[in-house]
Structures are given as C-alpha cells and as structure tokens.
Amino acid sequence: NAQLIDTTTGGHVWADRYDSFLNDVFALQDKVTQNIVTALAVNLTAGEQERQARKETDSPAAYDAFLRGWAHYLLHTPDDFAKAIPYLENAIELDPSYGRAHAALATVYWESRDNYWVKSLGVSYIEAREKTRRHLEEALKDPTPLAHRTASKMLSDQDRWDEAIAEAERAIALDANDPNGYEAMGRLLVKVGSPAEGLDFIKKAMRLDPQSDYLFRLGDAQFHLERYDEAAATMLRATKRNPGREWNFFLLAAAYGQLGREQEAKSTIEMFNKLRAKVGQGPYTLADVDDWDFKEPAERERLRDGLRKAGLPEGKAAPRVAALPSEELRRLLTGTTSTSESGGWHVYHAPDGQLFGRSFSGSTDEGTWEIIDGGQFCRQWTYWGGGRKACFIYFKKGDEYEYWYADGSRMRGKFRIRPGNPENL
C-alpha cells in the first residue's frame, strides 16, 4: 500500500496498492513515480523525464549495496568511510557501469584525503587521489548530481571557484529534486563570501532530503552570517546526532568562542582534539586554519577569531636550529624539484623565478618564487592558495627538509630535493 498525504491539511492526495516480485522492484518504482507525478499534475523537465526513463542500474542487489554504503558515508566519520567502501565496491562488481556508485566512491576517497583519513582506508594520499580520479571519470560517463557535486568539491579545493560553481549548477540542472547540487552550491557560496545566499541553498537541500546530515553546512552558513547563537544551537544538535564527526565540535567551539562561552569552548576543543587523535592527528592550532579554502580572507579570519577566543593555541614553535640562510636556500632550490613526503606534490623552481607545480589531486599551477633577506622563500601561485603570496623558512633534517611558515608558527611540510625537472612540470 502506498499513500501520498498533504502535510498542510492531513488529507489524502493519492493512494494505491501494488503487488510485485523483488526482481521487478525498479519497474514498480517507475510505476509509483509516474502515478504520483500524475496525481500532483507535475510538469517534469526534459532532463527529469529522461532520468526517470533511464534506470541507473538493473540490479536490485547493486542498488541495495549502494544504499548501505551511502548510509555509512552520511555518518561522515573515518570508521564509517572505511565501512562504506566494501558496499560501494560490491555495487560496482554487480554492475560495473553503475555511475552513482562510482561517484560515491570518488566522494569517499576525495573527502578522506581532504580530512586526513586515508590511513583509516588503508591507502596512501596518492592512491586516494588515483582512485578518486578513476571513479569520477567513470561516473561522468553517465553523470548524476552526485558526480558533479564531487567534481565541484575537487575544484574548490584547488581554489578554482568559477569552475566549481559551474559544476554545482550542472548538478542542479540535471535534477532539480536532488539535494546534492543544492548542498554543493550552498557550501560554495559560503566559501566565496555569500553566506546568506548559501543558506538558502542549504535549506533547500535539507527540505529535499531531511534524513541526510546537512547540519554542519547549516551551522557553517549561520556562523559566517555572524548568527552565532543559531550556529551554536545547530552544531550542538550536530554533535548529538553524530558524536564521531570531529568537525562538528570544531565549528561548535568557534561559535562558543564568538559568544564568549569560554568553558564550553574549552571542553569542545578538547573533544575535537580527542577525536583527531583517534585517526593519528595531532592537536589543532590556529595556524592550521590557513588550510581552510575560502576565497575571501575575511571568512577565514572570522573562523580563526572564534577559535582564538575558544582558546585554540597559535601553533607549534619552529625547531631550535638555524634556518637555512638566503644564499644556501637559493642554491638548494634553483633548478631543482621538491617532492613532498607523501610523494603527492611536486614543485619545480625554475632558474628564472618561475614556479611549476602538480598536486596529489592531479591539478597543476604556475607561479613565481624568490628568496628574500632573512632566509625566507616566498611563492605566489596563480590559483593555489587563492593566489596569495606566502613565505617560509627552511630547515635541513638529515636527507629531508622541512619548511615552516615564516613566523615559525607551524611546519607546512617535509620534502626531498631532486636536481632538474624530472616530473616534466
């Protein structure tokens, strides 16, 4: 039995009874959908009609495996990401062309890399990047809103904001009743400095899918609108709904900080760091906020200010050894390629001051570099880092080098040096 109720009046709009076999479940679904559309006199767009007519998979078992994997993804914890993967891989084994399952795997691998959770999945950053690329490539052969949402997230992580917004627009155009496009657009609008518009899109996503956990996105928009009481209430709900998701505590602490609720902020920071420790991450510092991708610096500073008021420390002190002096640093870098400890980043320092890089996501960028007095290496990419100039100091540690922010607040990374341009950057 199926019924459609008007929630504003409590009256029945439509009801019917159906009998079917399990292997006919998709045909039954199509029939129910068409009857609901008729009852509501809905005019579907051409794209929606096409998607209704075209099945994403003919395998009920693949669909069931996808749903089980997606349920774990929605909990957004390291353990649940690890649990999601076998189900999603099983969905693809049952139907190798199942685009939504490929998109879901691309999402899990990319976000695990983004959250520093790859160890929980048993892969390296390079492997996570490659799996993301491969599954997204498959997903975009027959795209779903989820595929465009994932592409949008990857582009925004590279500060390619216009392209990221275009992908979110494609997700919405493909299916106006799928929440993924609205969630992607809402997130982006907050990042580019339009939180009021972003809030509208996030609320739309929540109306379309009340079961998904969009509370972090809602609280994020409220926070950047400086509606800190609302943000704190939202994020408190989020921590109760999903106590294993550390970033819920992170944003709650920032909201408490802005509200001057010092004791609550302190205990929330402690819980946040406790959850980080479970996945092998050290205590968070204010310097780590530099890694948050915002187009507008004011949005990042608002977050940093809240966390500072919450008692988050500035950062770890630089090593008590001498940084490399200017001339030694210039000789070290000129005409050489630095490769990150993970092997995912490669940067070639051309002798003419040009800079060429490739990230673990496969994206590339160009920029300029220079050595200034005091032994500081300064670089400015075209896209990465929002095109902002950043300066660092360097330390030699055995066969490796460390580079730290110029103020000594935090190590940025470790790398090895190779002569020339072996990566053809």
Each language-model region and where it sits:
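Acidic, proline/glycine-rich low-complexity intrinsically disordered segments
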Residues: N1-L225, E230, T234-L236, R245-F249, ...
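Lipid interaction determinants
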Residues: A318-T368, I372-L425
